[in-house]
Structures are given as C-alpha cells and as structure tokens.
UniProtKB/Swiss-Prot annotation:
Subcellular compartments: Cytoplasm
Enzyme class of the recorded protein, top EC level: ligase
Protein's UniProt name: UDP-N-acetylmuramoylalanine--D-glutamate ligase
Role summary: Cell wall formation. Catalyzes the addition of glutamate to the nucleotide precursor UDP-N-acetylmuramoyl-L-alanine (UMA).
EC number: 6.3.2.9
GO biological process: cell division; cell wall organization; peptidoglycan biosynthetic process; regulation of cell shape
Main location: cytoplasm
Taxonomic superkingdom: Bacteria
Pathway linked to the protein: Cell wall biogenesis; peptidoglycan biosynthesis
Catalytic function, reaction form: UDP-N-acetyl-alpha-D-muramoyl-L-alanine + D-glutamate + ATP = UDP-N-acetyl-alpha-D-muramoyl-L-alanyl-D-glutamate + ADP + phosphate + H(+)
GO molecular function: ATP binding; UDP-N-acetylmuramoylalanine-D-glutamate ligase activity
Binding positions for ATP per the UniProt entry: G108, T109, N110, G111, K112, T113, S114
C-alpha cells in the first residue's frame, strides 16, 4: 500500500488511531486526526473535513457504519478502513524470513482474549517472537496492531479481532483463523444478527493453513462450511464432546485430535493431553470451566495448524493462567456452616459469556450481579436457561429495564434487588452489600453482568477491580474471624 503523499483522515484518536497516525506520518502521509474529545486533534468536527482532498479514512470502532461521516466518505468513493486493514496492507517483511510474519486471527462473541493469550504463550515457548495484538492491546502504543505489523522482528502476530474491526476490513488472508462462537452482541452497532455474523466470518476468507471453528455452534459451523479458503487449508472443528473426523475434542478424559492437525490422518485418533493436566484452569473444587476448555482446544488447533512443535506447545499450555476478571475468585468469607465465595467475571459483557459463567456453578448457588449497558440485547433466554442456578439477582447499571423484564417474565420467583444507578462511585459497594443479604454457606456471589461497563465504570477491568475491593471489604466486616 502506497501512502506517501496521500491524505488520511483518522477518525478517533484512541490508542489504535494515534498509533496508526504515527506509523503513517513516518511514511510520508498527510494525516488529519479528528476527535471532538482530544485537544491535540487536528480537527474536532467532521464538518470541518475537506473531503475533496481525502484519499482514505481510518474509522475507530466507536463509529458504526451508519455514522454520517462514514456515509459521506463512501458516497464520495473514499475507502473507509479499519486499523486492521491498514496494518495488514502496511506490514513489512520479517528480518529473518524475508516475508511478512504470519497472522493468526481469533474472533467470536466470547473467548477471544484467553484464546489469543494461550496462542501467543505456546508460540513464544516454541522460540518465536509472537506478541498479542489487535483488540487485546493495552494502552501501550508500541504493541498496537499497526506497530506490530510494521516491526520486522516479530515472527508471528496473534491478533484478537472484534466484529467492529472486521467490518471495515476486507483484504485479510490469515495463515490461521478461529471463530470461537457467535451469539447476539453489538447488534445495535451492526444493524442485525446476520450483519454481525458476516463481519465475524471475514477471518475465514482466503485463510491459508487452518481455520478453527466451534463445531457445537450451528452458525459458526455454517460459516466454516461456506468459507472460501486457500487450497490446502485445513478446517478443524472443536467440540467438548468426543470428536468426529475433522474435529478436535474430549474423549475419555483426553484431548483427542481427529482432524489431522496434530499429525495423524484425518479420522485417526491422536491423544494429545489428559484433561487432568489443566487443573490450573479449574475452580477450587477441581472441576474445569467448560468455556476455558473450549479456549484450550481452539488455541491448540491454531498453533498446530501453523506447524508449531506439539510437545513444546502442550507444555506451555498446561502452565497457562488466564488474565484477570475472567471467572476469578477474588474473596472468600467464612460464615456459619461454611463460606461464601466472590467470583469476578467482569469480562462477561454479554449474555453468551454470562451463560458460560453461570452454568459453571451448582443449582441455586449463585447470587448474580447483572446489568449495565445492554447494547440492545434481551435476556429472557439467558434468565430462563439459568434460573435453576440463580438463587437471587442484584441488578446494576443505567440500562436496567431489559434485565428487570427478563426476570419478571421468566423467573418471577427469584428475588431481585435493583441498585439505584445515580451514584457510580458507590454502586458496587451497594451491590455487594445487597448480595450479602442473600448469601449463606456454599453460595457464590458472581459478578458476570452480561452487559458492557461503560455506563458506570471506566472499563470492565475497573468494574472488576471495584467488585473485588467491595467483596474483600464485605468479607472482612461480615465474615467470621
């Protein structure tokens, strides 16, 4: 992609936008940064853009496809691209191989981050410079996707891809790609379920070595079957059940490959590791969280699809620990007859993730902190499906009505406490106090809200940290000593 002497409008100066602006300027591009909230922006309104002299637009994920400036650029025939698309087209040759580093792309409604981290850890153990990048990126601009793609030292990029990023991305041809699952999320942004799925499916287009898909998800399986991949690209389904030919799964307590990705023939059973090797991913009673097992299968199929050493990868995987705010016990209070456990799953920002979290616990054991920014989602199916697990619910957030209506229609016998949304600073303290009124020995106070956090918190991490602090305080005040 030739960007010297071109004019690029960067819409949104967050980490990805600011980083891309720097990369482009280093290549002689005239960059116009537009952000109404950033004093350092070149312009603070899209009304001030001289569209007659713009060659490309990079759109931040905060802007949906129906945003006026996006429509105006498209009307004029100006390409609107994501940072992912720019990074893909700007990538440089690896200094050792002389060709661009392979990209492994992971998307899905849930499981993206853990899978991306597992993939990176295994490849790093195999001696490769394989950073995580993309939607997973922290505030470190040196590890943004555009920086990683233009760094000749990286051997492989492990890229978490959101549906927002993929919408304005069209030329990807990943070496390996995975879709972990698809459930209703961000439907307001995409304008519907089919649009959302279509954007997710872009990771499979023209994939070169392997695509990995959830064989227990009908929509993902359909996308994999329809995917137009490069000749010789392997399609690997993962399942938590015994695998069929073409799949990797669980059989008699073992991870078993029958896809051929582990070196055997398609249909031949190859035992890879005992599930008991992954007790570090288990809850305190030793039972494994099913969604983390799914992440293990996905990541393993991806690295084997790339050709990584099997034994080295497995050794790294068996010592992997997921990041914070993912079904993490943050406090435990001794009470009469036992204890109450507080579990932070703030990363569960949609119904699909919350279902996976809730389903990990025994019947009528969960006091559930739910709610937040619903993003157009409904929760009737979730509440109906998990009513047997939920002992009580405490609803937070500014957008409480969808969750309130779900309990009223699907589980009217479950007690519900609604937290006044007015004071953001104390909302989590009040929520945990409310949970304490229901808690008894053996119960789990689970914060897996099924909603985004930005209505009352800085991020899902901020929400999780506040929950952990409130849980520890409650345990100190109310727990037996």
């Amino acid at each position: 992609m030739q960007v010297a002497d071109k004019t690029v409008v960067i819409a949104g100066l967050g980490v990805s936008g600011t980083s891309l602006a720097e990369v482009l300027r280093e290549r002689g591009t005239h960059v116009i940064g537009v952000d109404e909230r950033k004093p350092e922006a070149d312009l603070h309104s899209f009304d001030d853009v001289d569209w007659d002299h713009v060659d490309y637009v990079m759109s931040s994920p905060v802007f949906n496809p129906r945003t006026p400036f996006v429509l105006e650029a498209q009307r004029r025939g100006i390409p609107v691209m994501s940072e992912v698309e720019f990074a893909w087209q700007l990538r440089v040759n690896n200094e050792r191989t002389g060709t661009p580093a392979p990209w492994i792309g992971i998307t899905g409604t849930n499981g993206k981050t853990s899978t991306t981290e597992m993939t990176s850890e295994m490849l790093t153990a195999c001696g490769l410079d394989a950073p995580t990048a993309g939607n997973i990126a922290s505030g470190d601009m040196s590890m943004s996707l555009s920086r990683c793609a233009t760094n000749p030292q990286h051997d492989v990029l492990c890229v978490e891809l959101s549906s927002f990023q993929l919408h304005f991305t069209d030329s990807l041809a990943l070496d390996c790609a995975a879709i972990t699952n698809i459930a209703d999320d961000h439907l307001d942004w995409h304008g519907g379920r089919e649009n959302y799925a279509a954007d997710k499916s872009k990771v499979f287009h023209n994939a070169k070595r392997a695509i990995v898909y959830n064989a227990q998800d009908a929509k993902v399986s359909e996308l994999a079957a329809e995917a137009q991949t490069a000749e010789g690209c392997r399609k690997v389904g993962f399942t938590l059940e015994a695998p069929q030919a073409g799949q990797i799964g669980i059989e008699d307590g073992w991870i078993v490959d029958r896809s051929g990705v582990a070196g055997g023939a398609v249909g031949e059973s190859v035992r890879l590791a005992a599930i008991t090797d992954f007790t570090h991913l288990a809850e305190p009673d030793g039972s494994l969280y099913p969604h983390l097992v799914a992440d293990v299968l996905t990541a393993l199929a991806l690295v084997l699809g790339l050709g990584a050493d099997r034994d080295t990868a497995l050794k790294a995987l068996t010592s992997f620990k997921p990041g914070g705010h993912r079904i993490e016990t943050v406090a435990e209070a001794a009470v009469e007859g036992g204890s109450v456990r507080f579990v932070d799953d703030s990363k569960a920002t949609n119904g699909h993730a919350a279902r996976a979290s809730l389903s990990s616990f025994p019947a009528k054991s969960v006091i559930w902190i739910a709610g937040g920014l619903a993003k157009g989602s409904r929760f009737e199916d979730l509440v109906k499906d998990q009513a047997h697990t939920i002992k009580a619910a405490v609803i937070i957030g500014k957008d409480q009505q969808p969750m309130i209506e779900a309990f009223a229609s699907q589980a009217p016998d479950i007690p519900v406490t609604i937290i006044d949304p007015e004071d953001n600073d104390t909302v989590m303290d009040r929520a945990v106090e409310a949970c304490g009124t229901y808690a008894a020995a053996g119960d789990i106070v689970l914060m897996a809200p099924a909603c985004a956090s930005m209505d009352q918190f800085k991020s899902y991490a901020d929400r999780g940290n506040r929950f952990a602090a409130a849980a520890k305080t409650w345990s100190e005040v109310h727990g037996l000593h």
